[in-house]
Amino acid sequence: MASRGVNKVILIGHLGQDPEVRYMPNGNAVVNMTLATSENWKDKNTGENKEKTEWHRIVLFGKLAEIAGEYLRKGSQVYIEGSLQTRKWQDQNGLERYTTEIIVNIGGTMQMLGNRNSNLQAMTVNDKNSTGIKIKKTDAVEFDKKIETHESNKDLTHSPSEIDFDDEIPF
């Protein structure tokens, strides 16, 4: 099997602000959020502990976006699997602008880690099969009701026939 390449990003970090939820004209949710990842090291010359933080723009779509908007807050720790995408647009002054984002869509994963504002200890939202979402949870009776609601709304996600996959090899 020939591969066109791999575009996969895996991050674990903390949200820098509450997720921003918007809706597209077709009613599907979109969430924009920023995720901070940090690395620590000890400076060999001074012995001083150093830290470097990177900020990542994350965009979630569909059910993942709805759940992120409802349950994630500034400071929430989250695991993200998605793909890297660069967008280009013109600003109000006509200058070309670029931004690089991690897109979490069909095939992407979001897992909440260490939610300190409720009794949810871990929740996984995985939209790999495009027919609905799978949610694993621990210690959240109230969340069961949300799962039933989301499972009964499977028709809100894309059916496999709506997604056009091009399986042809480009040579």
Curated annotation (Swiss-Prot):
Domain SSB as annotated: residue spans: 6-111
An annotated GO cellular component: nucleoid
UniProt keyword annotation of Cytoplasm present: no
InterPro entries per record: NA-bd_OB-fold, Primosome_PriB/ssb, ssDNA-bd
Disulfide bonds: none
Alphabetical GO biological process terms: DNA recombination; DNA repair; DNA replication
GO molecular function: single-stranded DNA binding
The protein's assembly and partners: Homotetramer.
Entry function: Plays an important role in DNA replication, recombination and repair. Binds to ssDNA and to an array of partner proteins to recruit them to their sites of action during DNA metabolism.
Name of protein: Single-stranded DNA-binding protein
Organism taxonomic ancestry: Bacteria, Pseudomonadati, Pseudomonadota, Gammaproteobacteria, Enterobacterales
